Amino acid sequence: MSNYVIPQPAQPSRPVQGTDARFPVRRVYCIGRNYADHSIEMGHDPDKEPPFFFQKNGGNVDSSGEFPYPPFTNEVHFEVEMIVALKSGGANISEADAMQHVFGY
């Protein structure tokens, strides 16, 4: 057990339906295909370069969690993401083999 100078947050995880197991949430890679207008606004061609970004685990809130924000906030923007949880890594995976790498949704 490490003695951290600054306490580390707990490992984010999600329950696996029908079991008592949990799936760890480590890295979330996002492809914003629905961000075409914003991509064009930023000078990019979304058909050639799909917007790609990372989601920080600390920013993830599930349906049972709270979303803290400053009390005098007048406007809050939110998004809902659909995720695919992978059970194995890989690169250049064919479409025919892709589902072999999926743990769940």
Walk through the language-model features, giving the residues of each.
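Extreme N-terminal tail/first-helix region
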Residues: M1-V16
